[in-house]
UniProtKB/Swiss-Prot annotation:
Function: This protein binds to 23S rRNA in the presence of protein L20.
Keyword flag Nucleotide-binding: no
Assembly information from the UniProt record: Part of the 50S ribosomal subunit. Contacts protein L20.
GO process terms (BP): translation
SUPFAM superfamilies, alphabetized: L21p-like
GO cellular component terms given for this protein: cytoplasm; ribonucleoprotein complex; ribosome
PROSITE patterns attached to this UniProt entry: RIBOSOMAL_L21 (PS01169)
An example molecular function term from Gene Ontology annotations: rRNA binding
Alphabetical keyword list: Ribonucleoprotein, Ribosomal protein, RNA-binding, rRNA-binding
Family: Belongs to the bacterial ribosomal protein bL21 family.
The name this protein goes by in its record: Large ribosomal subunit protein bL21
Amino acid sequence: MYAVFMSGGKQYRVKKNQIIQLEKLNNSPGSIIEFDKILMISAKKEVKIGEPFLKGTKIKAHVENHGRLKKIKIIKFNRRKHYKKKQGHRQYFTNVKILDINNFNGK
């Protein structure tokens, strides 16, 4: 069984007990969270697709930890104008473990 849900403007395909990396969530490590914007659920040969979301369906997850990704460098440069701008960015993330995919509408 797998599900597709939306978090932080992105879509993620998950299975039970899978650990995924999401955009930063404002939940403390060790807390349990629920995602209710479920786009699709597939169980064996049965597929349910939401319009746009499935009602009565939730994904339960455990917040493992927070962190930051590797630094990326941004460089702007104009030749012959003596202009060079260098900038860096480190994106925050949250690791989440999927505990359960609940489908209250059906089996």
